Amino acid sequence: ISSQEKSIQNMTRALPECKACINNPREIRCYTNENHRIISEMFREMKSACTDNSIDCNFMREMIPHHRGAVRMSENALRFCLCPELVPLLNEIIVSQKKGIKEMECLLKKLDC
């Protein structure tokens, strides 16, 4: 949570410089199409996550695809011309979400989920 709060603060500071970065229509279309694909896949994976009588396990099984979606959306954005202030934030999201995925996968194993 603290890393997410830090990311939000950094994004707020980056806003003025980022407003000056303009992408062309082709870039917007490519970015948007891929983002829609990523989001659809993320929700499909979340909805199809195995459920049982453990809220702990169910929550983590649903959150892992959510975190993967955040990683994929960040990687998608990094393919395009971005405000330089945004690049480290996206990299931070990738690192923190991948760490969260590993932690939840380990917990799932420990809990025999």
Regions found by a protein language model. Give the residues of each.
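His/Met- and acidic-residue-enriched segments that coordinate or traffic transition-metal cofactors
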Residues: I1-C113
